[in-house]
């Protein structure tokens, strides 16, 4: 199982936003090349859940993908850490939350990537 958000991109249109549920979860916003520019979450403070969050971003992104997830805070941090491990930085529209751990992708024989928390030399 991949820890990356691998759902298909959807065009950021009012029609697609209206089809979303009001549930909680995480999402990624993409530019015209479907490159991640922001990772966000719909948490307990979000009005109308994922639908409300996408409505706020209607004019700032071309594409989105989302995942309903009740462990949204942990999943959000996980997606940020994976992006940072892959690209060496956070998405351009995310600010540094200041509390992220680090992941190190490890290749295996299947060609998929696993992750492992970085260990200090004392470990």
Regions found by a protein language model. Name each.
Residues 1-37, 41-123:
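Boundary/linker segments flanking structured domains
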